[in-house]
UniProtKB/Swiss-Prot annotation:
It comes from Shewanella baltica (strain OS223). GO terms for cellular component: cytoplasm. This is Erythronate-4-phosphate dehydrogenase. It is an enzyme of class 1 (oxidoreductase). The gene is pdxB. Keywords: Cytoplasm, NAD, Oxidoreductase, Pyridoxine biosynthesis. GO terms for biological process: pyridoxine biosynthetic process. It comes from the Bacteria. Homodimer. Belongs to the D-isomer specific 2-hydroxyacid dehydrogenase family. PdxB subfamily. NAD(+) binds at D147, D233, G258. Catalyzes the oxidation of erythronate-4-phosphate to 3-hydroxy-2-oxo-4-phosphonooxybutanoate. It catalyses: 4-phospho-D-erythronate + NAD(+) = (R)-3-hydroxy-2-oxo-4-phosphooxybutanoate + NADH + H(+).
Length: 376
């Protein structure tokens, strides 16, 4: 069995090595000719899976995407061809949630404006939006959720309108899929008019899709309003973001919010489980066995951490400033965006760091935030 796999997908060899011959490929430049003889195709979001790519292949048994979203996959075409498909919903939700939370802590420190006491509006309450809310609520932050689709489906959580978030939130964090049509289309959801309407000193965080914000309009509005603070992990026109926009963001990264070791492993592992199920064989590998030991054994806390100390704990796990600096230095290079993604040293999630503290009940919130070793 020939397993064609994106070269940037981790842990493929230990998980799929027993199932067939693994052929690594560049996901962004993948051609129909390369796919022609594949039995299994494993991709990430940089690969467009459609008739153009697959029409020459009559052997394909399974397509898997190690991603939350599926907007890069023509699902109708796969269904028409009866080709089983699986993605990995929620695989990197924890990573994205922690990234957004860390970015907010970093902004709070940079501008001497504590996160505690602010109101955060989350637009899109799926896996990543929910994970972001979980971090914020663990820390005691008031969260407003906006998701008209979830609300219509009967989700029991309390939802508010986007206008309410615009009026009440100090921070807005975007977590919607990209949709181009329909009542709730998200392309340019934040257009020039909405960007201009942001209340003074709003922090705007985008970890979903670049097209959700009109990037040209964002440049125009930000140049007029220095009070707005931007955290941008995604960009219109990836992998070539508008060069004028990058310097206007407080933190800028190349679509890596979901790039935790745990998240990447989880994505590949979910595809492994689904392929095994399809082939009717036992999935006998373990996710935990894939992950290396974290380089910091444990941190002993003398007192329950304040916000400054919490940021320091977060930096033990992931220092966002490093990726921000590297991105600014390399994004204008040829293939700079993709090269940084490809060579990214995947960070760990909070769960990799064990904390020790005598007054356990005082730090239950750290456990709820995801850290190990403390709390109930």
């Amino acid at each position: 069995m020939k397993i064609l796999v994106d070269e940037n997908m981790p842990y493929v060899e230990p998980l799929f090595g027993d199932l067939g011959d693994i052929i690594p490929v560049n996901g962004r430049t993948l051609t129909a000719e390369q796919v022609r003889e594949a039995d299994v195709l494993l991709v990430r979001s940089v690969t467009k899976v459609n008739a153009e790519l697959l029409s020459g292949n009559n052997k394909l048994k399974f397509v898997g995407s190690a991603t939350i979203g599926t907007d890069h996959v023509d699902l109708a075409y796969l269904a028409e061809r009866n080709i089983p498909f699986s993605n990995a919903p929620g695989c990197n939700a924890t990573a994205v949630g922690e990234f957004a939370f860390i970015a907010m802590l970093e902004l709070a420190q940079r501008f001497n404006s504590p996160l505690k006491g602010k109101v955060v509006g989350i637009v899109g309450a799926g896996n990543t939006g929910t994970a972001t809310a979980k971090c914020l609520q663990a820390y005691g932050i008031k969260v407003l959720l906006n998701d008209p689709i979830k609300a219509a489906e009967g989700d029991p959580r309390s939802f508010v309108s986007l206008d309410t978030i615009m009026a009440q939130a100090d921070i807005i964090s975007l977590h919607v899929p990209i949709t181009h049509t329909g009542e709730h289309k998200t392309k340019h959801l934040f257009d020039e008019a909405r960007l201009k309407a942001l209340k003074p000193n709003t922090w705007l965080v985008n970890c979903c899709r670049g097209d959700v914000i009109d990037n040209q309009a964002l440049i125009k509005v930000k140049q007029q309003r220095d009070d707005l603070k931007l955290v941008l992990d995604v960009w219109e026109g990836e992998p070539t973001p508008l060069p004028e926009l990058v310097p206007l963001a407080e933190f800028a990264t190349p679509h890596i919010a979901g790039y935790s070791l745990e998240g990447k492993a989880r994505g590949t592992f979910m595809l492994y489980q689904n392929l095994c199920q399809l082939l009717n064989i036992t999935a006998d590998k373990s996710l935990l066995d894939l992950l290396p030991t974290f380089n910091i054994k444990a941190v002993e806390l003398a007192t329950a951490p304040n916000e400054k100390a919490l940021l320091q704990l977060a930096r033990f796990v992931y220092d966002l400033r490093d990726d921000d600096k590297m991105f600014r230095n390399t994004f204008l290079n040829e293939n700079g965006f993709d090269t940084m993604r490809k060579n990214h040293q995947h960070r760990r999630e909070f769960s990799a760091l064990a904390l020790a503290y005598d007054g356990q009940s005082e730090v239950d919130w750290l456990s709820n935030l995801g850290f190990s070793g403390v709390g109930q």
